[in-house]
């Protein structure tokens, strides 16, 4: 029998759903929007269940749930929507277990595939140099140049850059104390150009910073600069310096990681510099464009030069 959303479900499937909806309303206190989402997803799955000839929720096993997830993927369902579907199903089965109507939750071990987030395109070295050719005496321009030099020179996250205090910077040794994710502290070196421009900024910082303000980088109001202000200023400098790519703080960090890996090929060192807990996170930065790979191959492979030299007549 083929069912549609307008086809009445058998009581053995519909009644447990109605009890669950009442449970969501009276005991869980979920918003109407969430309740509607759960109902929509569960009704859809109940009709799939009926189409497959199953007459009771207790007949559902992990294989059926995986089949349902696969069907959603093949139909182009978004990862977030599939995650909502599986979440509602897990909650429903937990409810049936509490009522003694099921022994185990068949959806517990099934998860939606994670949506791969595309990494931003990194800047090439020429673009970075073009961006960092800011050479103005205005205190805000000096601050912005120092921020960009430090972010690219030390591979900082935006939150890390904003949270840096004056006391965290050791100009003589070129060392920076950083508080990263999970409040984990690390010390990182930074570039000579970052040292130069942070030093210039410190000489004019007192003209802007409010008394007692510990932040290294401050706004026009004299307080710690905000994440949004950093993003806005970097984007503006990208346009002003005629850099083709849109400039963002993460793109500078990404460029730092890519350029360091291209130059050193030391994944473990870059992991430490970036503050990644797992090296698998750092490995996403190892993508190199084909041109770079081809150049590296031609320079390193013993047969490559001969191949290039042996041109056919």
Swiss-Prot record:
InterPro entries: CB, DNA_brk_join_enz, Integrase-like_cat_sf, Integrase_catalytic, Integrase_recombinase_N, Integrase_SAM-like_N, Recomb_XerC, Tyrosine_recombinase_XerC/XerD. Keywords: Cell cycle, Cell division, Chromosome partition, Cytoplasm, DNA integration, DNA recombination, DNA-binding. The active site is at residues 157, 181, 250, 253, 276, 285. It comes from the Bacteria. Coiled coil: none annotated. One of its GO terms (molecular function) is DNA binding. GO terms for biological process: cell division; chromosome segregation; DNA transposition. CDD domains: INT_XerDC_C (cd00798). Pfam families: Phage_int_SAM_1, Phage_integrase. Residues 11-97 form the Core-binding (CB) domain. Site-specific tyrosine recombinase, which acts by catalyzing the cutting and rejoining of the recombining DNA molecules. The XerC-XerD complex is essential to convert dimers of the bacterial chromosome into monomers to permit their segregation at cell division. It also contributes to the segregational stability of plasmids. Belongs to the 'phage' integrase family. XerC subfamily. This is Tyrosine recombinase XerC. The lineage of its organism: Bacteria, Pseudomonadati, Pseudomonadota, Gammaproteobacteria, Vibrionales. The gene is xerC.
């Amino acid at each position: 029998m083929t069912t549609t959303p307008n086809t009445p479900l058998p009581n053995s499937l519909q009644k447990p759903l109605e009890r669950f909806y009442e449970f969501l309303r009276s005991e869980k206190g979920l918003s109407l929007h969430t309740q509607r989402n759960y109902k929509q997803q569960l009704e859809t799955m109940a009709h799939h269940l009926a189409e497959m000839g199953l007459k009771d929720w207790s007949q559902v096993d992990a294989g059926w749930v995986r089949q349902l997830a696969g069907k959603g993927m093949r139909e182009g369902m978004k990862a977030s929507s599939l995650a909502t579907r599986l979440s509602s199903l897990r909650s429903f089965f937990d409810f049936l277990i509490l009522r003694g109507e099921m022994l185990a939750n068949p959806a517990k071990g099934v998860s939606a595939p994670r949506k791969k987030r595309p990494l931003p395109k990194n800047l090439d070295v020429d673009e970075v140099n073009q961006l960092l050719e800011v050479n103005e005496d205005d205190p805000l321009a000096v601050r912005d140049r120092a921020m960009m030099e430090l972010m690219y020179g030390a591979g900082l996250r935006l939150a890390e850059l904003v949270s840096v205090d004056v006391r965290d910077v050791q100009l003589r040794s070129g060392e920076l104390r950083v508080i990263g994710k999970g409040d984990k502290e690390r010390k990182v070196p930074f570039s000579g150009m970052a040292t130069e421009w942070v030093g210039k900024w410190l000489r004019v910082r007192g003209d802007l910073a409010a008394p007692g303000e510990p932040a290294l980088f401050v706004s026009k109001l004299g307080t710690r600069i905000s994440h949004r202000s950093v993003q806005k200023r970097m984007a503006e400098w990208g346009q002003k310096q005629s850099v083709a790519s849109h400039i963002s703080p993460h793109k500078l960090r990404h460029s730092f990681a890519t350029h360091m890996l291209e130059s050193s090929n030391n994944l473990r060192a870059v992991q430490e510099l970036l503050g990644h807990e797992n090296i698998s996170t750092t490995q996403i930065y190892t993508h190199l464009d084909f041109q770079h790979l081809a150049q590296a191959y031609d320079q390193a492979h013993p047969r490559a030069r001969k191949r290039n030299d042996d041109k056919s007549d």
